[in-house]
A protein has these predicted regions:
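Conserved active-site segments centered on acidic
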Residues: 1-69
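Structural signal for conserved beta-strand scaffold positions within catalytic alpha/beta enzyme cores
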Residues: 35, 80, 98-101
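N-terminal/domain-start segments enriched in small and hydrophobic, helix-friendly residues
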Residues: 1, 8, 14, 73, ...
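Short glycine/proline-enriched coil/turn segments at helix->beta-strand junctions
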Residues: 28-32, 74, 92-96
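Generic alpha-helical secondary structure signal
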Residues: 46, 73, 111-114
């Protein structure tokens, strides 16, 4: 049996979806994981990298990636982190998507990004439990 693949998507793939990918990789060994965006940035948000390091998860090797049809087709479950603009919203391109509607960390203070990180961690751990119960 092929390992189920989980895909986290947002617009820039520089913050929220990268946090989710980092937590998911750390806590879910029965699944593959990746993240992508419809308009990916060239690098990760440095504050996001910093707040993930604070909890012992190094995401410096993760890179923003362009969302592709293959990623969507290969995904067992796709999670949209939320949209900062409707024209580029990944949920427009994915039929079966779970939308978490999480605030974008772009331009936020480190304290605000920590709260976003913690919210994403809670959502990821809840998702892992549900997925493990389903397989």
């Amino acid at each position: 049996m092929q390992t189920p693949h989980v895909l986290f998507v947002c617009v820039e793939n520089a913050g929220r979806s990268q946090i989710a990918e980092g937590f998911f990789r750390e806590h879910a060994n029965k699944f593959e994981v990746t993240s992508a965006g419809t308009e990916p940035k060239s690098e990760l948000n440095p504050i996001v990298v910093k707040v993930m390091n604070e909890v012992g998860i190094d995401i410096t090797n993760q890179k923003p990636k362009l969302l592709s049809n293959k990623m969507i087709q290969d995904s067992f479950r796709t999670i949209n982190m939320g949209c900062m603009n409707k024209e580029s919203c990944p949920s427009l391109f994915v039929n079966d998507v779970l939308d978490w509607n999480i605030t974008d960390p772009k331009g936020k203070t480190i304290e605000e990004v920590r709260k976003i990180r913690d919210q994403i961690k809670f959502e990821v751990l809840s998702l892992i439990k549900k997925l493990e119960d389903d397989i």
